[in-house]
Regions:
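Pyridoxal 5′-phosphate
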Residues: 1-95
């Protein structure tokens, strides 16, 4: 019996394989990214950068959290086809 033909790897706009965007063990086939799972490497790097900025000047960082959340809602809502005023961030949307 011939080996199964697998589809071409899913590619991101950046030109890298989608699988390579996560810091997952390449020897394991990961199927669950719904209720729990790894965070893409680019997201982890951005989170680290935000934590460093907060740690550099907490006195300036924390008073601006509401403004940063509002800005993030305004940027993400159009991507989701929603209005910013109808959008919220929650810790776990599946809970």
């Amino acid at each position: 019996m011939p080996a199964p033909a697998f589809p071409a790897p899913l590619m991101l706009k950046s030109g890298i394989r989608a699988r390579d965007a996560w810091p997952l063990d390449p020897d394991v086939i990961h199927l669950n990214h719904g209720s729990f799972g790894a965070v893409p490497t680019a997201v982890v790097e951005h989170q680290d950068a935000l934590r460093r900025r907060a740690d550099l000047s907490p006195v300036e960082w924390f008073p601006r959290i509401a403004e940063r959340v509002r800005d993030a809602r305004e940027r993400t809502a159009p991507f989701l086809g929603a209005h910013a005023e109808d959008s919220v961030f929650v810790p776990n949307a599946s809970a």
